[in-house]
């Protein structure tokens, strides 16, 4: 191993200042939770420059890099221990990688040799510089075609060289600054807000006109895979960036439209605690119940702004919605003290990030994390809610079709959901005042399931799945109430 380190929030802030890339996926934990990453991730270029810095600090004998190919194969999360390694070093070739728990996150293939002549680029060098942005551009995929321009470096090359001295010795200060500018281009300009930087291929040039700027032009878009290829030209380098435009966060049905599918007083006897009601299926469930005359309490663990938005929409329409903070990993009773009304129903949509990097076929830590949410957390909450519900409680537990039809790399998730189903059966048998509804939900368009490829969900919509469930829960509630008054 050449070197190792952990990236923390302070490192993100410093690199954002150097590069100008303040994409929320890196800087905003609340916004990042609504991306496929599920949490803030380290800038790929930051990890790359650290990798070059580690190499350059210990191998001053390496000659000129003539060409460079980089692949960002996995995301690096804050707190991950990243290891740097050289896998091959000869007179003509350098191969290196960064890894987390043995899983490769970045690979480098560099050819060593003489530099190429300065490249010509089809952008008028007298064209105006693209204005520096402090917020990432939200650009639709169709509007990225033929985008081009010039971008000034956010930081002078000398400061970048000070931050990454080993990388500057290997590449030169202007090239390090150009790489820093490339992450600003991807994260803030195009693709912008919903970007993923997947790789780059560069030819290093003997450019004597060392202007502190980067020229760029979008050269190809593959709409099916949302792939965007960007040609670049800067001081001492020329080539292209491989990027993707992520699917934007999924918006759930507005309550006014939800109301078109339910009777005004259909759920008028319901007081529903919707755990994880600040977005996704929880948000939709809260809107359906409120539109049907029910009272809802939505919870959030970290997304207070999202929960407040849902409550404001419901209240503005004329419904009833309260908001409380709730963390399923903590003791339940104290967190429920702020409830103004006693729930008759409980909907449980709490979940950690589902699609995460795995170091092996089976990851015990991931199973334990899933169980904390899907088993332990559910049991703690139900027991606490029952202590506050003298007339009993109906609870909905969302399992998954993945229990039976499991995709690759989802074994821990499927195991935990299966365990949750068994737990629900035992709870229903042991807790006489509890009614539990378990449904294996199909893949549905939510922030957690969004992907780069447009997936055909066979016409299944969140509304078509959740409305029948809410109606079944209403029947459970009536059955339970009638059994207690008989």
Give the positions of each predicted feature.
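Conserved glycine-rich Rossmann-like NAD(P)H-binding loop of the short-chain dehydrogenase/reductase
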Residues: 293-309
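C-terminal helical subdomain
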Residues: 245-247, 435-486
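Catalytic loop of short-chain dehydrogenase/reductase
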Residues: 259-263, 351-429, 440-447, 453
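HotDog/MaoC-like acyl-thioester-processing domains
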Residues: 1-7, 67-140, 204-272
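Conserved glycine-rich cofactor-binding loop
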Residues: 278-279, 302
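Catalytic strand-loop segment that frames the active site of acyl-thioester-processing enzymes
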Residues: 1-40, 117-173
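Hydrophobic beta-strand-centered segment that forms part of the acyl-chain substrate-binding groove
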Residues: 34-91, 174-215, 224-227
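Rossmann-fold cofactor-recognition segment
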Residues: 314-331
């Amino acid at each position: 191993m050449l070197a190792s380190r952990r990236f923390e929030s302070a490192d993100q802030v410093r690199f954002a200042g150097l590069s100008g890339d303040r994409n929320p996926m890196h800087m905003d934990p609340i916004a990042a939770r609504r991306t496929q990453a599920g949490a803030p991730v380290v800038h790929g270029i930051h990890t790359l420059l650290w990798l070059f810095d580690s190499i350059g600090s210990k191998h001053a004998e390496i000659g000129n890099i003539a060409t460079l190919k980089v692949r960002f194969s996995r995301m690096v999360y804050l707190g991950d221990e990243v290891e740097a390694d050289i896998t091959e070093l000869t007179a003509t070739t350098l191969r290196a990688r960064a890894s987390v728990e043995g899983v490769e996150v970045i690979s480098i293939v560099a050819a060593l040799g003489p530099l190429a002549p300065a490249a010509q680029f089809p952008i008028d060098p007298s064209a105006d510089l693209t204005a520096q942005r402090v917020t990432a551009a939200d650009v639709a995929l169709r509007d990225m075609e033929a985008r081009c321009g010039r971008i000034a470096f956010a930081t002078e090359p000398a400061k970048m060289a000070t931050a990454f001295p080993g990388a500057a010795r290997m590449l030169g200060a202007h090239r390090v600054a150009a790489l820093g500018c490339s992450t600003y281009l991807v994260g803030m300009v195009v693709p912008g807000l919903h970007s993923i930087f997947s790789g780059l291929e560069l030819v290093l040039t003997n450019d004597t006109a060392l202007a502190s700027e980067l020229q760029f032009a979008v050269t190809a878009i593959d709409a099916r895979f949302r792939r965007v290829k960007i040609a670049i030209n800067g001081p001492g380098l020329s080539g292209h960036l491989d990027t993707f435009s992520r699917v934007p966060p999924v918006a759930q049905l507005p309550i006014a439209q939800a109301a078109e599918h339910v009777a005004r007083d259909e759920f008028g006897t319901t007081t529903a605690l919707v755990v994880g009601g600040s977005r996704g299926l929880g948000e939709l469930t809260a809107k359906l119940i409120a539109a049907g005359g029910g009272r809802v309490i939505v919870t959030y663990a970290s997304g207070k702004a999202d929960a407040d938005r849902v409550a404001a929409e419901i209240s503005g329409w004329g419904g009833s919605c309260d908001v409380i903070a709730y963390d399923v990993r903590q003791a339940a009773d104290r967190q429920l003290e702020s409830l103004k009304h006693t729930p008759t129903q409980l909907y449980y949509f709490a979940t950690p990030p589902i699609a995460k990097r795995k170091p092996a076929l089976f990851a015990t830590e991931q199973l334990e994390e899933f169980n904390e949410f899907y088993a332990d957390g559910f049991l703690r909450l139900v027991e606490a809610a029952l202590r506050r519900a003298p007339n009993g409680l109906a609870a909905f537990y969302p399992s998954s079709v993945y229990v039976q039809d499991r995709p690759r790399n989802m074994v821990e998730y499927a195991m935990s959901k299966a365990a949750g189903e068994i737990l629900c059966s035992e709870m229903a048998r042991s807790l006489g005042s509890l009614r539990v509804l378990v449904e294996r939900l199909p893949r549905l368009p939510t922030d957690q399931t969004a992907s780069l490829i447009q997936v055909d969900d066979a016409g299944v919509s969140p509304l078509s799945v959740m409305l029948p469930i809410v109606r079944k829960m209403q029947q459970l509630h009536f059955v339970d109430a009638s059994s207690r008054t008989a």
